[in-house]
Every structure is written in structure tokens, then in C-alpha cells.
Amino acid sequence: MAKEINMNIKKCNYKLTNLYYGLVFSGYVLTLVINGFRSGVFAALLMVLIAAITGIFAIKSDTKSDFISLINVCVFAYIIYNFFSFVWIMKNGFPLSVFVEEFSNSVLPAVFYFVPALIIKTEADDIEKEKITDSIYKAFIVAFTVFSIISIILYITAPQFYCDYLFNMSFISKADASTCRVRMESFTGSTSISYLGVAAMLVSARFMYKYASLLSVNKTNDKNKNNGDTLKQFIIYSALFVFSLIVVFLANGRAGMVAALLVIVYINILVFSVFRFADRKYLYIEAGAIIALIVILCIITPSIVSKIWARLVSLPGAIGQRSEQWVSAINNMYGQWFGNGLGANGHKAIGIEGAKVVADGGLVKLYCEEGALGFSLFAFIILVIVRQSFKDLKKYFSELGIIMTALLMSIGSNIIAFQLCMPIFYFALGVIGADANGNAKEKGELKEENKCG
């Protein structure tokens, strides 16, 4: 009976995690037609539900002792540390609402770390684990693609009701079509859609590599009958990779475009140099195709190319402009060890006396709010996970990319404090963390067997 209950809890967690981005994206679309619909509150409630289901499963599991590991304890401690920061944020004169919103946006998504760490890990079969992980990634990319198609249609047509919506949401300064088309704001803002596009590129690359590997194996084993479906899947995810890249450039965010270009370089280095998976001639073909595309765009739409180039080359100057804001925020911290409290340097604190808002620079903002202790704990978690990813880069290159691009973009933007972006970030951390815990346990069991022998 208990085993059946655990199985039902686990299935419920799978389904809710699979549906999460689809439901949240639907919530954002609903804000267009339902005035006053709180998409952020809706997303927070879903995360609380996922946290509750995951926690119940962990408590009822027969192997819950397996989940007590250094990295899992550190992530849990990080959540608790930030939760109790409401004490010093209120002590520093900030209202509780500032803390609640920031906790919901940047820390509550950490529950997604425990989905693979506590749920997927219980599957004894590695193949079954991979299937579950793949299903969650596929659900994310399907939801993102549908959401992006709706966004692109509205961006291109720019109907007046959509322009009014963007103006009311403070995404644009004037409710007309020309202002609407400066960048694709979607329903979430251009920064969020940029990072999600980069994450979708990396998820697509995961499946491209998977199906390309299957094609290679089938060719070696003369299993040509299986090549049709595998090739179809490879083409689909290649198209999704390109589509996600286009979405990032339509969003017209500097950090997003740079991250997308770095992802292309990263994937090519892995495929042609690290993994040595493909012949170099394909690299030359790809380079030729990219050059040809740029030349064609320069001929057909030179204004778009010059606009993108101007955005990219302005990145160093933008960082220089924001550095003064960062230095001011750090120099005016209430306490170096514990920080100002979660939310004290966020947008919600604008207008509060004594607040030093870090409008762009998520990592600096995180340091100011969490202090040396909280930020060191966060950095330790990242370092442990990244170190583990390098032990099996073929398996984790997608997750590593999702993590590192979020950190890279958080130098000049507040990606790390965006509620919509953080679930995929923490899920990627959890996928690597779950296997790190499993490998440590296997090594321990092997040592015990050797002692007995």
C-alpha cells in the first residue's frame, strides 16, 4: 500500500513538472485577456505544490537516507538561509512584501533542483532516468516553442490591443506598432525570453547529439530501418535550435545575443574538437553557410544587420556604465557577512529610503542581498555541480551550458532573479547533482564490498 502511494506521488510530480512551463506560459498569455491576472502568483503556487509533493515523497520514501548528501544539504541550507533573511531585511527598514516577492522569484524555483535529486534518482534503471529527464526537457521546449510562435505573431502584426498591453505592463514607452517592434517583449519582457531561448537552444542541442549518435550507431550496425524516425527527430531538433536562436535575436537583448553566439561556438568546439564526433568538413560547410547567410542579410536588410552589430559592440560600454551602480551598492551594504536581506537591492525596493537598487547585475545584487555567507554557499553549490559535469561532459554538456549562460547573463542583467528563468536553471543543477550523489553512494558501497572481501 505504501509503495503504491509513493508511486502515485511520484507520477503526480512527473506530470506537474512536465506541465509546469506549459501552465506558466498559458498564465502569461491569459494576462492579455484577463485584466489583473497574477501570472507570478500562479507560478509561485505551482512551485509550492511541486515542493510539497517532492517533500512528501522524500519523507515517505524507503530510501530517504540516500538523499542526505553534501550537495543536497547545501542546497537545502541555501533555501533556509534565504528564508530567514526576512529577519534582517525588516530590521533594515524594508517591508516584508519586498522579501516575499524576491523569495518567490529567485529562491522558490530551487525546488526544481530536488525533482531529479529526489524523484528521478529513485529509478534503478539509468535508461528510465534518462527517459524521465528527456520528457521534462521535451515538455519545456514544446511549451517554449508554442509560446514563442504566439509572441512572434503578435510582434510582427503588432495589433493595437497588444501595443496597449505592452505599454500598460511598462515594457514599451509608447503604445504604437513601431515601438512594439523595437524588440520582441513577448508577455514576459525581452530579457526573460532571451535566456529561455538560449536554454531552448541547449536543450535542442542535447537531443541533436542524442539522435546523431543513434544514427551513427545504426549506420555501424546496418540498422538502416531505424534511421528514418531517428533522422526525422534530428531534423526536428535542429530546426528547433535555429528557431530558438531566431527568438533570441528578435528579443534584441545584448546579453542574450552574446550568449546565443557563445552557445554556437561551445557546441561546435564540443562536436568537432572535444568529442571528435563529426568530420571537420562539416564545420567548414557550417561556417560557409553562416557567412553566406550574413552576406544575404547584408544585401536584403542591411539595417537589421547594422542594428544587431551596434547592440553587440555596445556591450562593453554597458558594463562600464553599470559598474558604478554595483560599487555603490556594495559600499552601502548594511552588513558584509549577512547582506541586506533578500529583495533589498531589487526593483521592488525602488523608492524606499536607503535602498541601493541594482537594476542590472544579478550576481552583484545576489552578493549585496545575501552577503558573503549566502553568496559563498551559492558559489560552492555551483562549483561542485560544474566540477561534476566535467566528469561526463557528453552527458551533461547541455546542463552545463544552461547553468553557465544564466551566470554569464547575470553579470549585466538580473536573470538569476527572474521567476520564469530559474526553474530550468535549478532543474539542470539537479540533474547533475542527482547523479553526483548516486556516484558517491556507489563508490561507498564498492569500498565496503572490498573491505568485506
Where are these regions (language model features)?
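Alpha-helical transmembrane segments of multi-pass inner-membrane proteins
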Residues: 134-164, 186-252, 257-270
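A juxtamembrane structural motif centered on a specific transmembrane helix
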Residues: 1-21, 59-61, 220, 224, ...
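Transmembrane alpha-helices of multi-pass inner-membrane enzymes
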Residues: 21-25, 52, 202-207, 265, ...
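A membrane-periplasm/extracellular boundary helix in multi-pass inner-membrane enzymes
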Residues: 153-159, 251, 268-313, 331-332
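A conserved mid-to-late transmembrane alpha helix and its immediate loop/hinge
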Residues: 185, 247, 355-389
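Aromatic-anchored transmembrane helix interface
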Residues: 73-76, 80, 95-121, 135, ...
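Long extracytoplasmic/lumenal interhelical loops at the membrane interface
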Residues: 304-370
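N-terminal signal-anchor transmembrane segment
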Residues: 1-61, 80-92, 406, 427
